[in-house]
UniProtKB/Swiss-Prot annotation:
GO terms for biological process: translation. Pfam families: Ribosomal_L32p (PF01783). This is Large ribosomal subunit protein bL32. The lineage of its organism: Bacteria, Pseudomonadati, Pseudomonadota, Gammaproteobacteria, Lysobacterales. GO terms for cellular component: large ribosomal subunit. The gene is rpmF. It comes from the Bacteria. Belongs to the bacterial ribosomal protein bL32 family. It comes from Xanthomonas euvesicatoria pv. vesicatoria (strain 85-10) (Xanthomonas campestris pv. vesicatoria). One of its GO terms (molecular function) is structural constituent of ribosome.
Amino acid sequence: MAVQKSRVTPSRRGQRRSHDALTAKQLSTDPTSGEIHLRHHITADGYYRGKKVIATKSSAVQED
């Protein structure tokens, strides 16, 4: 088992943990549908930045 050579001070421990904080997910609202989605991801309807990018099952059923 690994054993440390010297004790880690509280400040050194805090410096190591300074990058462990969690951040909230960045959400965007689609301009055409108004749907909330993750940044740089398409919506469930297949829209990205206001344009239809991919045909989805729900849109294929509505077109028929």
